[in-house]
């Protein structure tokens, strides 16, 4: 839609003392600009997520027998390098995915939490095995009933112990979720200057809700 703007010109010596000009709808220009920037932002996010999902560096960390199955995925039979996750890191500061493979004991819980906090964003967690998921058969005082009680978990891999194919499937599920993430790409520049957004992942926001669902009430409290 075209708009005609009429501007008064008091210094004009001829009639009419005004100037008419036909311009585009300013709302249409803003929509076109926002659509272009939105598509450009989607393209940048897709490119960043594609690189992140194909360069997952696992943290070399195992707590029990499930780690044996995890190590099997690195052999030539399963070849975890096909998914870009063969670069095992010995330091949490160089890794972006922690695979908790095995039982999480109470004495090990603060160590796991500290190592998770030392990892840089973006970071993900895979809980491997029944013991890491819910404590497994160890319903005793010395075992944490699920590693998600201390750190947020992205993917749960069931089994006791799970086969290497199950871990690979869990890794593929994590890659699929990474492609749908909308994380800040870094420093943003806008009309108000330069800023770096701090966004809390939805996984961390709903951590307490997930724990509340897993905490079953006793018959006395029903």
UniProtKB/Swiss-Prot annotation:
Binds 1 [4Fe-4S] cluster. One of its GO terms (molecular function) is quinone binding. It holds the Pfam family Oxidored_q6. Signal peptide: none annotated. Keywords: 4Fe-4S, Cell inner membrane, Cell membrane, Iron, Iron-sulfur, Membrane, Metal-binding, NAD, Quinone, Translocase, Transport, Ubiquinone. One of its GO terms (biological process) is electron transport coupled proton transport. GO terms for cellular component: plasma membrane; respiratory chain complex I. The keyword DNA repair does not apply. SUPFAM superfamilies: HydA/Nqo6-like (SSF56770). It is a peripheral membrane protein. Its main location: membrane. It catalyses: a quinone + NADH + 5 H(+)(in) = a quinol + NAD(+) + 4 H(+)(out). [4Fe-4S] cluster binds at residues 65-66, 131, 160. Transmembrane segments: none annotated. It comes from the Bacteria. It is found in: Cell inner membrane. Residues 201-212 have a biased composition (Basic and acidic residues). Residues 200-222 are annotated as: Disordered. It is an enzyme of class 7 (translocase). Its cofactor is [4Fe-4S] cluster. InterPro entries: NADH_UbQ_OxRdtase-like_20kDa (IPR006137), NADH_UQ_OxRdtase_20Kd_su (IPR006138). HAMAP family: NDH1_NuoB. NDH-1 is composed of 14 different subunits. Subunits NuoB, C, D, E, F, and G constitute the peripheral sector of the complex. Belongs to the complex I 20 kDa subunit family. NDH-1 shuttles electrons from NADH, via FMN and iron-sulfur (Fe-S) centers, to quinones in the respiratory chain. The immediate electron acceptor for the enzyme in this species is believed to be ubiquinone. Couples the redox reaction to proton translocation (for every two electrons transferred, four hydrogen ions are translocated across the cytoplasmic membrane), and thus conserves the redox energy in a proton gradient. This is NADH-quinone oxidoreductase subunit B. It comes from Psychrobacter arcticus (strain DSM 17307 / VKM B-2377 / 273-4).
